[in-house]
């Protein structure tokens, strides 16, 4: 049978298909094949109408998945016949339609591409040293989108009218900036300026002034892609110390920005995973193991007393221009691959605990007394996005914080269901929205102990829902009723008349790992973190669970230790060590071992009387107790400092470890014998290695027994303690050796930043989980 000379088809592309150069890509492919038709953004994705010979239509569908733009991700193609009588004169990019038939993913921001860098450093190019250069393959996306479909009028560039040259590029199908929505140049784009501490705008080149301030040891506030950064010379001990003092951040490690991997070579070990993460379009902060020379080459205050360093490369043209200026403004990009002397501390511009600042006026007000110079511009940041953080320390990279370049993080789910709004936890808060078989995890909001972060959570819920066009049908939150996120969830559910699903903390941790792996079948779950409220009202932090569609069943926990002074023990690890000594019958040693700690005698009496010493199975507090016994933790200056210092002491693990644990009849794993051994050790490295080695072996045996009892052989791991590389990689290897399959979330954070995904998945797995209308 002869084929018709002409046929028509309509394709709907779903996935990351807007803001990534998909329409220009479709235009080029269609015109190269002689097809007529049009392509347009819609609220559901990208719609393509094609008319032409059947062979050419088939060739288009065959080639499209292999010729996608670098930032695109194609999840599905919906195909239907073109309406009869449809005619086209050539192929065109048509005006967008704001229809909402399916959730559309807002694209994350992307680091500067090589082609834009070539132009940025070419003195003969009209965008030479233009701090807002971008194209369809790179630049800001999520941070400047007001709403979808993704068009210039829906972004913070709407007020910048294109000059004739930019308009020509924008309309030229052969140009890299064909329909690049944030397109800009020195003639028509945003403007950069410098202001001093008095708010006076300074004359001269802003980049030159900024670099001069850094060279003088001053602190620079610069408006980045998703928020402001504070920067100083990472080799200048005085500047780093002053930044710590002004920011009220006494010890928490700072991130380091270098021009390229060659500039990091002497400081950190660059493995394949680390290089890929550093140089990828997300350009996150990457945790890399320090080389011995790092502490001599950097100011002592950059990342004190830790075995790793958080490093990143310039991700925006503005950051790149600081390094270009320091190199003497060379022509071309050859210098950009060579080692450069400039190393910068680059940290979020906020007071510790508060969200990053996004607006110029807010920066002037809130950073007064912190920054010496402000590098500002007038491209508004509509959606705050802190830097993403990725660990490249272990066998495979994993996300610690999802932000700029990664978020909103889209996770395909193994099944669909009602749309869920999940509010996450109190710490490292992020929210999750679902529609059908897709979940979107928001950028990191932060800790909800801060009022500004609480307001950021409220804005995130509104903005992400608006961008995705999702109206939640159910609300999920943590079981703890006093968390701000839980109170917000309760209020939201009441206002909208929606069912509320409180999900136990560790259940959510395990469900997040299941969601990422597309699992609806039962698994063993091992959750290790600081604490979560159990269904019985007790504080738990180390639990063995069976998690399935019908809910979460308790299988065992770490043997509880007393928390002298309650939550204060999480800030003073010596208290946990004192609690361990008391539990070992060695309370008489507390006063002498911790003579330098105020209140040591009072803590000993509290333990003797059992007053204000609630028991907790927290794995995080177990690490604190071990660190305290080894003299590594008096008072924590930031969260998990003692545990991080303990991990940093590990060079290798013992080949064989003594059985310094017990498993009782109630399946509680008791590690007091291990703590007793640590209490008598003076070698901190040997003690840290023994602690990790015994803990890994004990957890593996505990999980293997549960696997034998339940018949389940997949072990989902969750909770912030698994950010410990020694524990994570060691336990996974030991579980595999025992014939079990360990599962880890690597895209969603293992810590509380992934809780919202787990809460949403727990609700989707079991629509019959008992819920209340606005009551937790």
Swiss-Prot record:
Which pathway features in its UniProt record? Protein modification; [NiFe] hydrogenase maturation
**Residues of the Acylphosphatase-like domain:** 8-95
ZnF bounds (C4-type): 113-138, 163-188
User: Which top EC class is given?
Assistant: ligase
User: Record's Pfam families?
Assistant: Acylphosphatase, HypF_C, HypF_C_2, Sua5_yciO_yrdC, zf-HYPF
Q: What PROSITE patterns would the database entry show?
A: ACYLPHOSPHATASE_1, ACYLPHOSPHATASE_3, YRDC
Q: Could you tell me which InterPro entries the record lists for this protein?
A: Acylphosphatase-like_dom, Acylphosphatase-like_dom_sf, Acylphosphatase_CS, Carbamoyltrans_HypF-like, Carbamoyltransferase_HypF, DHBP_synth_RibB-like_a/b_dom, HypF_C, HypF_C_2
| Membrane-spanning segments | none
Q: Which GO terms describe its molecular function?
A: carboxyl- or carbamoyltransferase activity; double-stranded RNA binding; ligase activity; zinc ion binding
The UniProt keywords, alphabetically, are:
Ligase, Metal-binding, Zinc, Zinc-finger
Q: Which reaction does it catalyse?
A: C-terminal L-cysteinyl-[HypE protein] + carbamoyl phosphate + ATP + H2O = C-terminal S-carboxamide-L-cysteinyl-[HypE protein] + AMP + phosphate + diphosphate + H(+)
Name a biological process GO annotation. Answer: protein maturation
User: Which segments constitute the YrdC-like domain?
Assistant: 204-405
Give its E.C. classification number. 6.2.-.-
Q: What does this protein do?
A: Involved in the maturation of [NiFe] hydrogenases. Along with HypE, it catalyzes the synthesis of the CN ligands of the active site iron of [NiFe]-hydrogenases. HypF functions as a carbamoyl transferase using carbamoylphosphate as a substrate and transferring the carboxamido moiety in an ATP-dependent reaction to the thiolate of the C-terminal cysteine of HypE yielding a protein-S-carboxamide.
Question: Which NCBIfam families is this protein grouped with?
Answer: hypF
Question: What PANTHER family does this protein map onto?
Answer: CARBAMOYLTRANSFERASE, CARBAMOYLTRANSFERASE HYPF
Which family would the database say this protein is a member of?
Belongs to the carbamoyltransferase HypF family.
Q: What is this protein called?
A: Carbamoyltransferase HypF
């Amino acid at each position: 049978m002869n084929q018709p000379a002409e046929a028509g088809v309509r394709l709907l592309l779903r996935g990351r298909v807007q803001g990534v150069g998909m329409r220009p890509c479709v235009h080029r492919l269609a015109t190269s094949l002689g097809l007529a038709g049009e392509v347009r953004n819609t609220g559901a994705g990208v719609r393509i109408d094609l008319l032409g010979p059947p062979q050419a239509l088939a060739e288009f569908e065959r080639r499209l998945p292999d010729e996608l733009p670098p930032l695109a991700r194609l999840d599905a193609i919906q195909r239907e016949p073109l309406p009869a009588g449809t005619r086209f004169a050539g192929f065109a990019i048509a005006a967008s339609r704001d229809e909402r038939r399916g959730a559309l993913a807002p694209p994350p921001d992307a680091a500067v591409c090589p082609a834009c860098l070539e132009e940025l450093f070419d003195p003969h190019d009209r965008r030479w040293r233009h701090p807002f250069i971008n194209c369809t393959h790179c630049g800001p996306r999520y941070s400047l989108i007001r709403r979808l479909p993704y068009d210039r009028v829906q972004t913070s560039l709407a007020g910048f009218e294109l000059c004739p040259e930019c308009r020509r590029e924008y309309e030229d199908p052969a140009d890299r900036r064909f329909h690049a929505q944030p397109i800009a140049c020195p003639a028509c784009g945003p403007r950069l300026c410098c202001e001093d501490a008095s708010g006076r705008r300074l004359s001269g080149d802003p980049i030159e002034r900024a670099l001069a301030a850094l060279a003088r040891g001053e602190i620079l506030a610069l408006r980045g892609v998703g928020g402001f950064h504070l920067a100083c010379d990472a080799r200048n001990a005085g500047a780093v110390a002053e930044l710590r003092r002004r920011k009220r951040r006494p010890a928490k490690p700072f991130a380091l920005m270098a021009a390229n991997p060659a500039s990091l070579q002497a400081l950190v070990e660059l493995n394949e995973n680390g290089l890929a993460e550093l140089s990828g379009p997300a350009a996150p902060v990457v945790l890399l193991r320090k080389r011995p020379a790092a502490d001599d080459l950097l100011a002592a205050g950059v990342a004190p007393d830790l075995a790793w360093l958080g490093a990143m490369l310039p991700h925006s043209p503005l950051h790149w221009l600081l390094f270009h200026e320091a190199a003497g403004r060379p022509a071309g990009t050859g210098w950009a691959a060579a080692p450069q002397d400039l190393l910068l501390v680059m940290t979020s511009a906020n007071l510790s605990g508060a969200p990053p600042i996004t607006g110029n006026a807010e920066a002037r007000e809130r950073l007064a007394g912190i920054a010496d110079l402000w590098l500002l511009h007038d491209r508004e940041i509509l959606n705050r996005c802190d830097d993403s953080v990725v660990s490249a320390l272990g066998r495979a990279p994993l996300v610690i914080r999802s932000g700029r370049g990664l978020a909103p993080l889209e996770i395909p789910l193994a099944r669909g269901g009602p749309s869920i709004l999940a509010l996450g936890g109190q710490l490292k808060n992020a929210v999750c929205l679902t529609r059908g078989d897709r979940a979107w995890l928001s950028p990191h909001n932060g800790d909800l102990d801060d009022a500004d972060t609480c307001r950021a959570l409220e804005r995130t819920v509104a903005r992400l829902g608006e961008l995705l066009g999702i109206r939640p049908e159910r609300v999920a939150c943590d079981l703890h009723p006093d968390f701000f996120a839980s109170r917000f969830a309760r209020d939201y559910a009441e206002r909208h008349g929606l069912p509320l699903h409180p999900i136990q903390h560790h259940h959510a941790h395990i469900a997040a790992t299941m969601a990422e792996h597309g699992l609806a079948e039962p698994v063993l779950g091992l959750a290790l973190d600081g604490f979560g409220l159990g269904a019985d009202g007790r504080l738990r932090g180390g639990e063995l669970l069976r998690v399935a569609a019908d809910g979460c069943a308790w299988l065992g926990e770490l043997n509880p230790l007393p928390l002298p002074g309650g939550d204060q023990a999480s800030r003073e690890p010596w208290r946990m060590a004192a609690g361990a000594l008391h539990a070992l019958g060695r309370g008489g040693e507390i006063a002498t071992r911790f003579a330098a700690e105020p209140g040591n005698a009072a803590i000993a009496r509290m333990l003797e009387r059992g007053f204000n010493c609630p028991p907790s199975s927290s794995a995080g507090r177990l690490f604190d107790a071990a660190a305290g016994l080894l003299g590594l933790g008096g008072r924590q200056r930031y969260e998990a400092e003692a545990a991080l210092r303990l991990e940093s002491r590990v060079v290798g693990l013992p080949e064989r470890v003594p059985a310094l644990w017990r498993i009782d009849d109630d399946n509680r794993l008791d590690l007091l014998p291990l703590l007793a051994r640590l209490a008598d050790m003076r070698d901190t490295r040997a003690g840290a290695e023994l602690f990790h080695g015994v803990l890994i072996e004990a957890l593996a045996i505990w999980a293997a027994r549960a696997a034998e009892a339940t018949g389940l052989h997949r072990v989902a791991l969750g909770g912030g303690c698994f950010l410990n590389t020694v524990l994570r990689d060691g336990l996974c290897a030991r579980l595999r050796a025992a014939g079990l399959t360990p599962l880890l979330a690597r895209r969603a954070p293992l810590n509380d930043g992934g809780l919202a995904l787990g809460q949403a998945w727990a609700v989707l797995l079991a629509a019959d989980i008992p819920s209340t209308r606005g009551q937790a």
